[in-house]
UniProtKB/Swiss-Prot annotation:
Protein name per Swiss-Prot or TrEMBL: Anhydro-N-acetylmuramic acid kinase
Residues that hold ATP according to the record: G9, T10, S11, V12, D13, G14, I15, D16
Pfam families reported for this sequence: AnmK
InterPro entries in alphabetical order: Anhydro_N_Ac-Mur_kinase (IPR005338), ATPase_NBD (IPR043129)
The species this protein was found in: Acaryochloris marina (strain MBIC 11017)
Root EC class: transferase
EC number(s) recorded for this UniProt protein: 2.7.1.170
Superkingdom of origin organism: Bacteria
Family assignment from sequence similarity: Belongs to the anhydro-N-acetylmuramic acid kinase family.
Function in brief: Catalyzes the specific phosphorylation of 1,6-anhydro-N-acetylmuramic acid (anhMurNAc) with the simultaneous cleavage of the 1,6-anhydro ring, generating MurNAc-6-P. Is required for the utilization of anhMurNAc either imported from the medium or derived from its own cell wall murein, and thus plays a role in cell wall recycling.
Reactions catalysed: 1,6-anhydro-N-acetyl-beta-muramate + ATP + H2O = N-acetyl-D-muramate 6-phosphate + ADP + H(+)
GO BP terms in the entry: 1,6-anhydro-N-acetyl-beta-muramic acid catabolic process; amino sugar metabolic process; peptidoglycan turnover
C-alpha cells in the first residue's frame, strides 16, 4: 500500500512528508521510502503556532482559523509529495501540529493537535487517519512517544542493545533489547521523552541573534564556546529529569520562560553567547545520557539518532563524549532516513489502523493496554 505520512513536531519548522510503500504486519513489516520532503511553514503561520505554544491567549475563532490554515498546509504537502513521486497514495497518516500537551498526573492527560484530518481527506481525495495520540491518553497513557513500535519493528538488532534517540524540538528515546524472534516482540522495550531536544538551543540562537537566526547549523556557533559544567549539573536537578518513565513533555515546560531562567542562573558566570550555546548543547546531551544512566536496565551498545538534532555535529560530539563506549550512529547508517523517520512512523500508524493493529506500546506510554490509534476520515 502506498501511504503518505505527514508530521510537524515541536520545532515547528515545517511539515515533513514521506510517501512510502508498506507491506507486512509487524516484525515482517516492509517500508520502502519513495519520496520525502520538508515543506517550511510560512513565517507568519509559524509565528502564530509558536505564540499558541507559548500560551498566549487566543480566541476560539482565531484557533479555528489556525486549524484551517494548518489543515490546508498539510493537504498541500500531501499533494506536493505525490506530484514529486508521480504516483497516487491510497492513505494518509497525518500527525497534525501539537499546540498543547498535558501529561497525565493522577488523572487523564490531554493533547491537542490541530490541522484536522477531515479537511486533508476532502482536499486530497485520499482517506486520512489523524488524531493519533488521544486514544492512548484516554487509556491512561502519555500519548507519547508513539514511534516506539516502528522502532521495534524496523530498528531492533539481534545482538545489540540499541537506544533510538529522536532529537526534534523535544527528545525521546526507544530502548530496544536484542530481538531474535517474534515471540520477543515488545519484551523489555522502554521509551519516554528525555527532555529538551533542539528547543532550548533554538530559542537561545533566536535570542542571541535578535531573531535573525532560528537554529545553530551543525552546532557551529556552540562549537566556538566552552560549556559550563556547574550550570549543567544545576539544571539537571529539575524534577522532570528525576522523574521515572513513563513521562512526556513539550514546549509547555521547555519554553521561553525556561530559557530565561537558564540565562538568569548563568548570569554570575559571565558567559559569552558562544559559551551559553555550548552549555545548552552539552546540557541537551547530558539530559539524554542522564536518562539512560538512571532508567535503563542495560547500557546501550549503539545510540541511533534521528530528527533535526542528528545533524548537529557539536551535539553529536557532546553525546559521544558523555556516552563513552556506546557507538553513536544515525538511522541513515542503519537504512532509515533520519529526516523522514517521524513522517514514516505516522504513515505506518495509519497503515496499522487500517489493519486493526494497535500502534502503541503500553510499556512505553503507560496506557492500560494495546490501543488502535487514529481516527479515520473517509472521502
Amino acid at each position: 500500500m502506498h501511504v503518505i505520512g505527514l508530521m510537524s513536531g515541536t520545532s515547528v519548522d515545517g511539515i515533513d512528508a514521506a510517501l512510502v510503500e508498506i507491506s507486512g504486519r509487524e516484525l515482517d513489516l516492509q517500508v520502502d521510502l519513495i519520496a520525502a520532503q520538508t515543506y517550511p511553514y510560512p513565517d507568519a503561520l509559524r509565528n502564530q503556532i509558536l505564540a499558541v505554544c507559548r500560551g498566549e491567549p487566543l480566541s476560539i475563532e482565531a484557533l479555528a482559523g489556525l486549524d484551517d490554515a494548518i489543515a490546508m498546509q498539510f493537504a498541500q504537502a500531501a499533494q506536493s509529495i505525490q506530484a514529486e513521486a508521480t504516483l497516487t497514495a491510497e492513505l494518509i497518516g497525518s500527525h497534525g501540529q501539537t499546540v498543547f500537551h498535558r501529561p497525565p498526573q493522577g488523572n487523564l492527560g490531554y493533547t491537542l493537535q490541530i490541522g484536522r484530518g477531515a479537511v486533508i481527506a476532502h482536499q486530497t481525495g485520499i482517506n486520512t487517519v489523524s488524531n493519533f495520540r488521544v486514544a492512548d491518553m484516554a487509556a491512561g497513557g502519555q500519548g507519547a512517544p508513539l514511534v516506539s513500535k516502528l522502532d521495534i519493528c524496523l530498528l531492533s538488532h539481534p545482538e545489540f542493545y540499541r537506544c533510538v534517540q529522536n532529537i526534534g524540538g523535544i527528545g525521546n528515546v526507544t530502548y530496544l533489547p536484542p530481538l531474535t524472534d517474534a515471540s520477543q516482540l515488545g519484551m523489555g522495550v522502554k521509551g519516554w521523552d528525555t527532555g529538551p531536544g533542539n528547543v532550548l538551543m533554538d530559542l537561545a540562537v533566536a535570542h542571541f541573534s535578535k531573531g535573525e537566526l532560528t537554529y545553530d547549523a551543525d552546532g557551529a556557533w556552540a562549537a566556538q564556546g566552552n560549556p559550563c559544567q556547574p550550570l549543567i549539573e544545576e539544571w539537571l536537578r529539575h524534577p522532570f529529569f528525576q522523574a521515572p518513565p513513563p513521562k512526556s513533555t513539550g514546549r509547555e515546560l521547555f519554553s521561553p520562560d525556561y530559557l530565561q531562567t537558564c540565562l538568569q542562573t548563568a548570569a554570575s558566570y559571565q558567559l559569552s553567547p558562544a559559551d551559553m550555546l555550548a552549555t545548552l548543547t552539552d546540557f541537551t546531551a547530558a539530559t539524554i545520557v542522564y536518562n539512560y544512566d538512571q532508567f535503563l536496565p542495560h547500557p546501550p551498545d549503539q545510540v541511533v539518532l534521528c530528527g533535526g538534532g542528528s545533524r548537529n555535529g557539536y551535539l553529536r560530539q557532546c553525546l559521544q563524549q558523555r556516552l563513552g563506549g556506546s557507538t553513536v550512529l544515525t538511522t541513515d547508517d542503519v537504512g532509515l532516513n533520519s529526516d523522514a523517520k517521524e513522517a514514516i512512523a505516522f504513515a505506518v500508524l495509519a497503515y496499522w489502523q487500517q489493519l486493526q493493529i494497535p500502534g502503541n506500546v503500553p510499556a512505553v506510554t503507560g496506557a492500560s493496554g494495546p490501543i488502535l490509534l487514529g481516527e479515520l476520515h473517509l472521502v
